[in-house]
């Protein structure tokens, strides 16, 4: 009889990925995925960049390359982190990964032994929870509100908990709630972290997708002790199919991530890195991101206006000012998984929120994505969702 490692008992397929199989049908109005709008992918420009790479350096592009990543792309990433996040870094502090999801997996493998404690926001990104589970940690959820992680609660936990090895956070337009941390909490968080000297994994896939207000500093830009490991990605600002992300950290920490990448995949795709670098050289990434923001902002406004009009009393919704998601809290007696099945019968999909709480509970919550559906479908789908909620109120 085949015997698997005990860690496999802790792992299960992502509910979101499983749901996406159901929602692939063209007649489904899906608010389930966190996917960018495919009509915004710069396909023709990417074809030009790809052709240029293969004509100029085809044999290099199709060969193995260094684990650290394509040097020119790493420098372009460092330059953009300075321009957009005020993070002073260089190519030597950048490791290119196969998406930031791989950076999450490496973070767990670098820092966590079985029984170690991970602190994270409540709720938090399901993909990170699943990546961390393979290393068999204990999760402690830190309460949040509209300003982000509540610092008083974080201090209480740190003062009374042993074996805290890592803190995982998404300060900008958090997945699943869409909420950003306010400026004061970012500064207070770093003061606390510096006192306890615990490594922080800052996941920032949505930082450039702000629709309202001023950009706030990344935690990494406030880091004076080298405790923040910053994860970035091209998935939300260019194209997820290339599977290109990066880790930015102090060299002694980055060396451990480098070992993990050597063991896991040797390197990220050479041709993908070179084509992305060439695209950045040939075209205007800032203009492309501005186009993405304008599209998502329009869809966000339509979703929020429809929710404000249709969502029954007793339900609440966040007001995201960036990112891809809105978060709905239903009456406590309502089960979002049961609601999901009823909505799927009406060809509408969303993600039940309980999956985003690693310790369970909160089954009366749900996550909505607004980036992938055209405005008329958003109105139709949200109206149907809210009608179904009303039909199930007590």
Regions found by a protein language model. Name each.
Residues 314-346:
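Conserved PLP-binding catalytic core of the aspartate aminotransferase-like
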Residues 224-294:
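Conserved core segment of the aminotransferase class I/II
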Residues 7-99, 106, 281-282, 349, ...:
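N-terminal small-domain helix-loop-helix segment of the aminotransferase-like
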Residues 277, 294-304, 316-329:
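Conserved glycine-rich beta-strand-loop-beta hairpin in the small C-terminal domain of fold type I
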Residues 345, 359-394:
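PLP-dependent enzyme catalytic core of the Aspartate aminotransferase-like
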Residues 60-197, 201, 207-225, 296, ...:
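Conserved core of the PLP fold type I
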Residues 72, 256-259, 290-302, 380, ...:
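A non-catalytic, amphipathic alpha-helix used as a structural packing/dimerization or gating element
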């Amino acid at each position: 009889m085949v015997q698997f490692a005990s860690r496999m008992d802790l792992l299960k397929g992502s509910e979101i990925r499983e749901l996406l199989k159901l929602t692939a049908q063209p007649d489904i109005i899906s608010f389930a995925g966190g996917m960018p709008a495919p009509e915004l992918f710069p396909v023709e420009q990417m074809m030009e960049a790809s052709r240029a790479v293969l004509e100029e350096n085809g044999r290099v592009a199709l060969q193995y390359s260094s684990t650290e990543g394509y040097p020119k792309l790493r420098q372009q990433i460092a330059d953009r982190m300075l321009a957009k996040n005020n993070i002073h870094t260089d190519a030597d502090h950048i490791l290119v990964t196969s998406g930031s999801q791989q950076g999450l997996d490496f973070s767990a493998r670098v820092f966590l032994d079985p029984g170690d404690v991970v602190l994270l926001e409540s709720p938090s990104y399901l993909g990170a929870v699943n990546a961390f589970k393979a290393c068999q940690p204990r999760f402690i959820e830190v309460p949040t509100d509209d300003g982000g992680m509540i610092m008083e609660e974080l201090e209480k936990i740190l003062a009374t908990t042993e074996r805290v090895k890592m803190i995982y956070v998404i300060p900008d337009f958090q997945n699943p709630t869409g909420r950003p941390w306010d400026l004061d909490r970012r500064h207070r968080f770093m003061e606390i972290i510096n006192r306890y000297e615990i490594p922080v994994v800052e996941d920032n896939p949505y930082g450039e997708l702000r629709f309202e207000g001023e950009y706030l500093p990344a935690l990494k830009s406030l880091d004076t002790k080298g405790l923040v490991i910053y994860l970035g990605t091209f998935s939300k600002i260019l194209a997820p199919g290339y599977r290109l992300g990066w880790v930015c950290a102090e060299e002694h920490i980055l060396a451990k991530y480098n070992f993990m990448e050597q063991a896991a995949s040797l390197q990220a795709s050479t041709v993908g890195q070179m084509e992305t670098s060439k695209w950045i050289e040939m075209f205007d990434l800032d203009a492309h991101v501005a186009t993405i923001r304008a599209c998502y902002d329009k869809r966000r406004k339509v979703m929020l206006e429809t929710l404000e009009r249709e969502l029954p009393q007793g339900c609440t919704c966040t007001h995201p000012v960036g990112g891809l998601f809105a978060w709905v809290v239903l009456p406590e007696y309502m089960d979002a998984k049961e609601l999901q099945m009823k909505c799927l019968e009406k060809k509408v999909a969303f993600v039940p929120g309980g999956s985003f709480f690693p310790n369970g509970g909160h089954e009366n919550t749900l996550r909505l994505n607004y980036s992938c559906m055209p405005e008329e479908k958003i109105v139709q789908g949200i109206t149907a969702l809210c009608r179904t909620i009303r039909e199930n109120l007590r």
